[in-house]
Amino acid sequence: MKEVIHSTLAPKAIGPYSQAIATNDLVFVSGQLGIDVSTGEFKGADIHSQTTQSMENIKAILKEAGLGMDSVVKTTILLKSLDDFAVVNGIYGSYFKEPYPARATFQVAKLPKDALVEIEAIAIK
């Protein structure tokens, strides 16, 4: 059985996908851009603003599922530039405590809406 998770405190999906899907003991959060739900636009044009908003969007979606950031077991970070790796790490690290989730980070040629970062997460109930 699967359940759609949708938070009004995070932006709507920009394509044919759900913000998150819960199934059995897992919640799969789709990639989140740094879009501010109140404006529908990026929180800012810089990596700091976009990363922070991406993480806040994940946090809001998890909250809708009754979970917190401490439930996250795996993340994937997509970056327009690996030059932003240190900044993203600093912000990312402020959302988690040890033991940190497993993670993969990739540089990609382009992200939706020309975003600088996209972050997806898997959490356990």
UniProtKB/Swiss-Prot annotation:
Q: Which GO terms describe its molecular function?
A: deaminase activity
Q: Which CDD domains match?
A: YjgF_YER057c_UK114_family
Record's signal peptide: none
* Gene Ontology CC: cytosol
List, alphabetically, the InterPro entries matched.
Answer: RidA (IPR006056), RidA_CS (IPR019897), RutC-like_sf (IPR035959), YjgF/YER057c/UK114 (IPR006175)
Which Pfam family is an annotated match for this chain, by its short name? Answer: Ribonuc_L-PSP
- Which cysteine pairs make disulfide bonds? none
* Similarity comment: Belongs to the RutC family.
Quote the protein name from its UniProt record.
RutC family protein jhp_0879
